[in-house]
From Swiss-Prot:
Pfam family for this entry, one: Rdx
Residue numbers bearing the S-glutathionyl cysteine modification: 37
GO cellular component: cytoplasm; plasma membrane
Organism: Mus musculus
Name listed for the protein in its UniProt record: Selenoprotein W
């Protein structure tokens, strides 16, 4: 069973390419293990929120910014690995 990863991003802000880039990187890192879905908000929210198995692990609104550095990406990878370990 694939692990749910949900990204809510500001659609009105044009963040969809950032979501698609993150999705591609995560699919490369965890081939066949993740069910990644993205939702763009129609209004300006500034959101780029990443939830793994129902737990918020990255939030632009809380000061994390975008997932635009290797350290931020590694933080997500660590959270996903921990969630996958709990599923086994």
């Amino acid at each position: 069973m694939a692990l749910a990863v949900r990204v809510v991003y500001c659609g009105a802000u044009g963040y969809k390419p950032k979501y698609l880039q993150l999705k591609e990187k995560l699919e490369h890192e965890f081939p066949g293990c993740l069910d990644i879905c993205g939702e763009g908000t129609p209004q300006v929210t500034g959101f780029f929120e990443v939830t793994v198995a129902g737990k918020l692990v990255h939030s632009k609104k809380r000061g994390d910014g975008y997932v635009d550095t290797e350290s931020k990406f590694r933080k997500l990878v660590t959270a996903i690995k921990a969630a996958l370990a709990q599923c086994q």
